[in-house]
Structures are given as structure tokens and as C-alpha cells.
Amino acid sequence: DYEKPSELFLGEKAAYDIDELIALMRCIKANPTYLTQGKADTVWPMFTRQSSYREDLLRLSTYFDGVKAHSADSYTSRWYIDETGTLQYTYSTEGMYDVLCYLSDMEAEGLIYSDCYDLTNKTNFRSTLWGTDESEAPAYGFITFDWQASSTADSLNKDIVVVLPPVAKVNGVWQYYIDNGRAIKPDGWSISVAGCATDAELYRSCALLDYFFTEEGSTLQNYGLPMFLKENETYTGPDGKEYPQYTDWVMETCASVAKGDLSTFLRDWLGCLIPIGYQKDIGFEYQYTSERGFEGWELLQNSTTHFATYAGEGIKGDNPNYYKMVPPVFSLTLRQKEAISETTTMGMEDLSEEMFNIVRYNAKGNAPNGISIPADYNEYLAAFEARNLDAYVTAYQ
């Protein structure tokens, strides 16, 4: 029972499916002048933060009957475990091919921001489409899949709200589900002896890694230099815990140069959050989360939405292993690595480019000369088989 139509999509009563979401996108696409009060003649219904995030579009696969794209938050986690307990490659499945065709239909209708696919374009589309409302030449976007704290930052746009995911038949059961579990990435948790010419260099490397697990080192990695923190003051998070508190300068400068995205500001301007193994603290993220961001967290936590977890548990359905996360990085032996590099070309970056060529050109039928688009799933699968998919999968299995 809805008091107004918008409740189908907004708030705790939201219960829309992917077809209804696409229908809403069509409404957004068709009414730019009305929606922007005459400021623009185009509103892009869906976009990714930047072109290097374009594989976030594939996360819509969950809402097309639960098709698996990634079994963790990383794009390299292109694996799932089937009902027999066997590791399988997600990008080569018929379900994924169908999803690419669905996305191509959306692209042909102008529902996806056209610059999202070009990896040479380094623009931050989120800043452009959500952060220019008050500029002389504003640009507008409607919806994206991204992290809540930075996406709801007040300095980016004060009108952004979090919504529940589409209801979908996931693992054979209708449910709310977000298949984007935060994975532990083991590639940042080791030191290669081969990279150290002497024992002294190895010991210094080990000391650096150890340092990040001391109180001082952890604070440095998560929050930055002491000068960035208030002396003798702490921040109380919504979990009741005390965390180091940033100075006003940090928050104000972050809003000015990074659109309120503190994670990006810390990494790109202040030099912390270095991708070397350390225990990440959520306290920095709490401090730049807006009131709408916290409302979004509360909405999701109080809903019946299910999430990917390390326990791999979820509503029972077709595949007992559906909810199990698969790491984005495997600790392969030298022999396994050699087998992959010598017998397959599955690791080439042009693989995802070929997939997005389907999105760009399949429905429109306008592929440039030299770009071949598979006519059906058999041709799509043949491209993987030509790269020796079987040997690649066997090495990981």
C-alpha cells in the first residue's frame, strides 16, 4: 500500500524489479527539461563513477534472474561455485551473454551514459553528473552503483539518496540481494623475497608491514599524519566506538578538492590508505558520511536485503554454493602461473573490451570496421574457447 507512486522505489516499502527500474529510466530520459527546470536537455539515467568502473554495469546481472558477474567487490573476482561445488568462470556463461545483450538494449535507448565505456576518458562522471547542479553549464545523471559515504557527501550533491536494490529472482528465490561483498585481497599481504636484493632490505620490508599493525602505524595508514587530527579529541561513531577525529581543515579541504570523497582525498592528496596489507578502520568513513548516508545505511540494515558474506549463507535455492564469495586473487604456484601464461590468453585486458563492444554495438548494429560482434551465445563462447578457457579454468580449479 503506497501513499504515492515514488514509494515503489524509495524508502523501506520499495519493491520494484529490473523491468520497473528500466521503465523509470525511460521516464527520466524522456523528461529532461521538466526534471531540470529547463537547465538541461539531457539527463543520463545510469552511469558509472568513471570509465575504469564500467564493469559495475555488469552488477545489474544480479537483477536479471541472479546471473553471477563477480563473487566479491573486485572486478577480477570473475568466478562462482556451481551446485556441484566446482569453480566456474562467470564471464563465459550464457547468462552473462544475455546480460550484455540486455545492457546493449539499454545503451541503444540512451539509458546508459555514453562515455562510460571509453577507458581513455579519465573524467570522474559522478562529479560531473551529480556535482555540477549549480554551475553555469550543469550536467545531470540519475542513478549509479557506488559506495554510500562518498556518493552522498553534501559537498557533492545534497539531493542524493540511497535506495533498496531491485527485487529479483536470485538463486531461484525472489529477494533483495546485493552481490558485492568486500573481499580480503591477499595480494597486499605478502612480501616477495625476489624483490629484496639483500636480507637487510627484506627485514626493512617486514618491519614496514609490522609497523602498520601497531597503534601508531594503523592510525597513520587510516587517518594520516598527526597534524591532520585534533589533539585530545575523538569522534564517536554510530557503533559507539571512539575514533581519531579529523581537523576542520581536513574536512573543508576534502570538500573543496575532492567533492567530499574523503577516501580519495586521503589516498591522492595526503598519502595514506596505501594499498599495503593493513587493518582498515571504518572511523574515517563515518566522519564524512552525511545524514543521508547514515539514513541509507539504516534503510539497508533494517530491510530484508541480503548481502554476500564470508559465511556464504543466504536463502536456500537452486545452488547451495551461490552465496559463497570467491577471492579476486589466488595464490597460484609457479607451475600454475606458467601454465596459464603459456597456454591461454584469458588474462588479456582486451577480453572485457570485447564484452563491452557487445554492449555498445550489438543492439545498434553499428560496430566500426574491424570490430566483430558475436551473433549468438555460441559465437560468444567460441571467443573464450579460442583463448583456451578450459585450461584457464582448470588451473584455477
Kindly give the residue locations of the regions a language model identified.
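Helix-loop-helix "hinge/cap" segment bordering the ligand-binding cleft or interdomain interface
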Residues: 1-57, 78-124, 191-204, 210-222, ...
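Short, solvent-exposed loop/beta-turn-alpha elements that line the ligand-binding surface or hinge
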Residues: 4-7, 69-94, 169-180, 234-268, ...
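Second-shell loop/turn segments in exported
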Residues: 5-14, 86-90, 335-344, 359-369
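Alpha-to-beta junction loops
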Residues: 129-148
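Ligand-binding "clamshell"
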Residues: 151-177
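Short, solvent-exposed loop/turn segments at the edges of secondary structure
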Residues: 182-188
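Conserved small-residue motifs centered on glycine
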Residues: 211, 215-360
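Histidine-centered catalytic/metal-binding microenvironments
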Residues: 352-397
